[in-house]
Amino acid sequence: MGMTIAEKILADHSEREEVKPGEIVMAKLDFVFGNDVTMPLAIKKFRELGVKRVFDRERIAIVLDHFTPNKDIKSAEQCKSSREFAKEMGIKWFFEGGSVGVEHCLLPELGLVLPGDLIIGADSHTCTYGALGAFATGVGSTDLAVAMATGEAWFRVPETMKFIYEGELQPYVTGKDLILHTIGDIGVNGALYKVMEFSGSVIEELSVEQRMTMSNMAIEAGAKTGIIEPDKKTLDYVKERAKRKFKVYKSDEDAKYYKVIEYDVTNWEPVVAFPHLPENTVPISKAAKMNIKIDQVFIGSCTNGRIEDLRMAAEILEGQKVAKWVRLIVIPCSPTVYWKALKEGLIEIFLEAGAVIGPPTCGPCLGGHMGVLASGERAVSTTNRNFVGRMGHPKSEVYLANPYVAAASAVLGRIASPEEVVK
């Protein structure tokens, strides 16, 4: 019996000929990482193990991205403990200040996570790297501590659901809409502890960055990871960045899937996920007619803060002004993205429109800082979660959308279609 990409990666990394769903394996890891929120507890657990050194100083990253720049004394202390640990252990890949970016943008951009890798990170959106053909999943700080010490982790081999996207994408429909539509279809528990394998001609046409958006949100359907078979686009992306050798895996033709779901996307349009779950999707044609007034728009995050996302937003915002009483916050997800946005004139477009530009940080996405919502406020956000209180007060509301829709909504002061602005 053939195996899926995910099964092949787990088999190779556990030194087995094959694995089957439900089996428990102990596997060697290619890369592990944590951030300023999850690393301090991992460090504490690491010390409790009595281990004197990490398994490999070049296969661990610490990315201080959630509350950067430090928002208060507590976050400063968390970053300090992570910094001191990195110095003590000689960890090569430590990022803060001018080098830091949102981890799930930064690590692929620097070639630290690669096709065929087995990766764990102490952050739920680690599944982003599945877009490169890696098996990447989030863990807690205790598992991270053990992984830093041993370079290994245990896994229960998940079943795989295959999603096939065919047809032709319409204007302003992006990878964000594909994954939101999918979550709206199967629900937030629709892929619980499954691998979501994305395929089809539409996926082949997507850029690597838009594929990352899709894999990033696999966790919002309960998935273990979201994976895409590497192709020429993938290899072109990683070859100029890769810091080490990598191996490409592809699913066998006779691989067994838990379920196969096929979509024709030809008539799909941008969608908005209403509070308070990503599954509450509404087509923009309907949402735009509901006259939902907003207070804030956030364009950024590990979901939609890459250069292509900023280009989408700038396409709508050029020559426009943000509506009165609306705050538009734009945060490039890495220093490289920020530089590109500057050189391409995107930052100028955002500033002229009336946006606030922030340094690379997770910040507003988790209601951490630099864009926290007050009671009763509504935000349109290009992020991945809209749970109760996600971006601030428990009585605030978050509507998830792609960068085109977010930008149009900022201009009109309500949830709006980009076609209402670009006529």
Swiss-Prot record:
Swiss-Prot/TrEMBL GO biological process terms: L-leucine biosynthetic process
Domain of life of the native organism: Archaea
EC number of this enzyme: 4.2.1.33
Catalytic activity line of the entry: (2R,3S)-3-isopropylmalate = (2S)-2-isopropylmalate
Signal peptide location: none
Binding residues annotated for [4Fe-4S] cluster, in chain numbering: C302, C362, C365
Pfam families reported for this sequence: Aconitase
Cofactor: [4Fe-4S] cluster
Entry note: cofactor: Binds 1 [4Fe-4S] cluster per subunit.
UniProt keyword list: 4Fe-4S, Amino-acid biosynthesis, Branched-chain amino acid biosynthesis, Iron, Iron-sulfur, Leucine biosynthesis, Lyase, Metal-binding
Molecular function via GO: 3-isopropylmalate dehydratase activity; 4 iron, 4 sulfur cluster binding; metal ion binding
Pathway listed: Amino-acid biosynthesis; L-leucine biosynthesis; L-leucine from 3-methyl-2-oxobutanoate: step 2/4
Family statement: Belongs to the aconitase/IPM isomerase family. LeuC type 2 subfamily.
Role, per record: Catalyzes the isomerization between 2-isopropylmalate and 3-isopropylmalate, via the formation of 2-isopropylmaleate.
Complexes and interactors: Heterodimer of LeuC and LeuD.
Protein's name according to its UniProt entry: 3-isopropylmalate dehydratase large subunit 1
Species the sequence originates in: Pyrococcus abyssi (strain GE5 / Orsay)
